Structure formats: C-alpha cells, structure tokens
C-alpha cells in the first residue's frame, strides 16, 4: 500500500516506549534528521518540542509550518530534498543545516509577530534581523493573511494540501466503539485540540454537530479532559500522549494523524474514520517570507513536484487541478 510505504521509514524511527514512572509514561516520538553526538534532554513530551535542526542561525533553509502535516513534510525536507538536489545537481542541501519548526498555527503567528518564543527559561529570538527566521511558511490561509498584514510574508501563497477532516483515535483498552455515535456515547474522557488551536477545535466541533447534533456534541465535550500535567497545547503531541498514559479514553484529531499514530503505536492505539468529515477539511499553503535564502527556491521547486503524490499517500486529499493554485493574501 502506498501509504504504508510512506509510513515505513518513520515507524522504523519510533523507539520503544520508556518504562512507566509513578505518574506518567514518557512517549518516544518519531525522530527526524541526522543523528548528532550531542548532550540530549528528552522530557515527557520532549523538552523542546517540534524544533528540528539548528537554531544558531547556521541553517541553510528554515521552514516554519503548522505542525499537523509533519509526518509527510519532515521526510520530504530532511531526506528526499537532499537526495533530489544531488540527483539533479541543482543544489547542495545538507539535512544537518535545515531547520523545521512544526507548531500550531497560532503559535507560529505569535513567534513571527512577537519576535520569539520562550522554551522554559530559554528565549529564542525570531525575526528578519535575528539569526532565526523562516525562508518559507506553511499554514492555512487565515494565519498566512495575518502574517501578510504584519509584513512577514510575501503577498501570494500556493495551495499544496487539503486535509480530510477529523478522525478518531482510541486507546486499545476501550472496547465496543466502532463508529462516531458509539464514540460519543461511550467515551468518558475526551482529549481534543485545546483552545490554543481554535481552527482545529472548531472544525472538530462543527463536524460533530453536523453528524450528531448540537446536544450530543455538547454532551461529548462535557467529558473533555481540559488539562493535565505536561500538556503543551499542541494536539499532535497531547492527544496520543494522553491516550497512552490513560489520561483519556478517546481523542479527536486529523484523520491522517489518527492513522499515523495508530500505526506508530499499534499495541496502544487504534484509529477510526469519520465518514463525511472530509467536507470540513482545510487547505494548507506555502509562501515565501521577506528574507528567503537561495535554497528556498530549489526547495519550492522540489516540493511542488513531489507534494501531489506524497500528501495523498499520507492521508490527505487528491487536489487535482487546484494543486498549486495561487492565492492572494
């Protein structure tokens, strides 16, 4: 299966889960990029989440992106793009010199408009006059328009992917749930995108309301696990973490991520589809910033060649003629 071929190299990188501590279990996330013989800190959901690559200003290519397509994007950026450069003799891309930041869209917007991010007690400045600043930004159209209004990105983006809406991700300890109606009636502890990700949260709620009605939707959200120790406000980390640690019974998350995590943690998690959810899917687009390096041009060329097949293989919609459509911001 084509999707299986895409997931295979990622799943090889998923290490065994760490032993159970008194209160929580560390979840070993898929690792990307070259191995470095450096001191490393890994907390319960990784100490510095969703920064892949150097943050000292040495990166040849820097991409800030909404994080929910990372299972497709990171292998393309860190493996296939350097291979493409060598094969076409078009560029020289060292994966050790590429930085990809994969955070929720509101966090990406805040980093770029407020000038940085605090990582615990450490502060990483971000800006066109700072060592760290993206060449390219990938996100939905609404956040890209915010960045355009702030003068961060150029005026035209191109659509490269469309999500297929939400799916269900369940702990394998939960039995008797095979569809959305059963999910709504039997899940007593729900984990879902927090208010820090309003776009995804609203999309899931709208899907539930269309499928189940407002009353059943409100009842299900009444069982939401709102917070827990170590929650990041990043659904692609919080949802599987809560399920694996028995902090929740079932979660709502993008369907491609539900399938990815069920394949990554087959002993712990299972995924279910939601027929009809695809009509609530959303576009993801790419745009250059006001400070793009030369390598970004080569990456865009490569990316727009491979994305039409790589994203459907990873559980996204087939875009057809709408792929690459320019959108004014």
Regions found by a protein language model. Give the residues of each.
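Bacterial N-terminal signal peptides
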Residues: 8-18
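Early extracytoplasmic/lumenal segment of secretory-pathway proteins
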Residues: 25-145
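A conserved helix-loop-strand patch within extracytoplasmic ligand-binding domains
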Residues: 35-49, 129, 133, 141-208
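Ligand-binding cleft/hinge of the Venus flytrap
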Residues: 79-92, 161, 179-233
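Hydrophobic residues within well-ordered alpha-helices
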Residues: 112, 183, 240-246, 286
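A ligand-binding cleft/hinge motif common to bilobed small-molecule-binding domains
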Residues: 138-149, 240-270
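Periplasmic-binding protein-like
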Residues: 162-165, 193, 265-300, 302-329
């Amino acid at each position: 299966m084509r999707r299986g071929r895409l997931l295979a190299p990622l799943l090889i990188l998923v290490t065994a889960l760490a032993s159970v501590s008194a209160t929580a279990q560390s979840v070993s996330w898929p690792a990307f990029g070259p191995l470095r013989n450096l001191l490393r800190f890994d907390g319960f959901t990784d100490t510095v989440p969703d920064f892949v690559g150097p943050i000292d200003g040495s990166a040849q290519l820097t991409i800030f992106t909404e994080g929910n397509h990372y299972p497709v994007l990171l292998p393309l950026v860190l493996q296939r793009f350097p291979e493409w450069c060598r094969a076409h003799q078009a560029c020289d891309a060292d994966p050790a010199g590429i930085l990809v930041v994969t955070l929720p869209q509101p966090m990406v917007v805040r980093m770029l408009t407020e000038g940085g991010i605090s990582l615990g007690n450490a502060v990483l400045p971000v800006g066109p006059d700072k060592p760290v600043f993206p060449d390219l930004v990938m996100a939905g159209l609404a956040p890209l328009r915010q960045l355009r209004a702030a003068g961060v990105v150029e005026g035209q983006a191109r659509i490269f992917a469309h999500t297929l809406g939400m799916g269900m991700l369940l702990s394998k300890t939960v039995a008797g749930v095979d569809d959305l109606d059963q999910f709504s009636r039997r899940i007593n502890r729900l984990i879902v995108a927090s208010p820090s990700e309003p776009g995804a949260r609203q999309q899931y709620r709208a899907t539930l309301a269309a499928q189940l009605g407002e009353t059943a939707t409100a009842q299900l959200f009444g069982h939401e696990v709102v917070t827990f120790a170590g929650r990041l406000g990043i659904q692609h980390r919080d949802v599987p973490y809560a399920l694996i640690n028995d902090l929740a019974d079932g979660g709502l998350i993008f369907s491609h991520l539900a399938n990815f995590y069920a394949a990554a943690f087959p002993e712990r998690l299972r995924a279910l589809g939601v027929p009809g959810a695809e009509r609530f899917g959303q576009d993801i687009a790419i745009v250059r910033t006001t400070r793009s390096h030369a390598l970004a041009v080569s990456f865009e060329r490569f990316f727009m060649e491979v994305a039409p097949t790589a994203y459907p293989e990873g559980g996204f919609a087939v875009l057809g003629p709408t792929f690459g459509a320019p959108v004014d911001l």
